[in-house]
From Swiss-Prot:
Assembly and binders: Homodimer that oligomerizes on DNA into higher-order complexes that form bridges between disparate regions of DNA compacting it. Interacts with Hha, YdgT and StpA.
Keyword Zinc: no
Misc. comment: This protein is encoded on incompatibility group H (IncHI) plasmid R27, a temperature-sensitive conjugative plasmid.
TM spans (from-to): none
Region of interest (Disordered), ranges: 77-96
Name listed for the protein in its UniProt record: DNA-binding protein H-NS, plasmid
Species in which this protein is naturally found: Salmonella typhi
CC annotations in GO: cytosol; nucleoid; protein-DNA complex
Chief location category: cytoplasm
Localization (cell): Cytoplasm, Nucleoid
Record gene name: hns
A Pfam short name: Histone_HNS
Gene Ontology MF term list: bent DNA binding; DNA-binding transcription repressor activity; minor groove of adenine-thymine-rich DNA binding; protein dimerization activity; structural constituent of chromatin; transcription cis-regulatory region binding
Disulphides: none
Length: 134
């Protein structure tokens, strides 16, 4: 909450500020705040009415489905069965290149993704990628 709102929410601060302001300005502030509160109440009631209308529509559709012999749970399960299919996991590719890194360890690379740093350095030194084929 901002400092201005904190001070508006504190009764002692409001009383102290109210003593310093003329009555006309205080009444004007009261009118404006009342308008804001009323607008907010109307927004909340309209949202509540929309939600109520939506729930009534859902219930009427559910009743129509039951009258036609369609179980809503059955309908939902048919959708979830299709979308919940497990994703196929791709098998790892076999290594295509073999190289020795800076520490002297022999490593492999499939040829996909970024070229390993040790292999890239050797390629820059003049070796060919075909030299590292397994």
């Amino acid at each position: 909450m901002s400092e201005a709102l904190k001070s508006l929410n504190n009764i002692r601060t409001l009383r102290a500020q109210g003593r310093e302001l003329p009555l006309e300005i205080l009444e004007e502030l009261l009118e404006k705040l009342s308008v804001v509160v009323e607008e907010r109440r109307q927004e909340e009631s309209s949202k509540e009415a929309e939600l109520k209308a939506r729930l009534e529509k859902i219930e009427s559709l559910r009743q129509l489905m039951l009258e036609d012999g369609i179980d809503p749970e059955e309908l939902l399960s048919s959708f979830s069965a299709k979308s919940g299919a497990p994703k196929k996991v791709r098998e790892p590719r076999p290594a295509k290149y073999k190289y020795t890194d800076v520490n002297g360890e022999t490593k492999t690379w499939t040829g996909q993704g970024r070229t390993p740093k040790a292999l890239a350095e050797q390629l820059e030194a003049g070796k060919k990628l075909d030299d590292f084929l397994i």
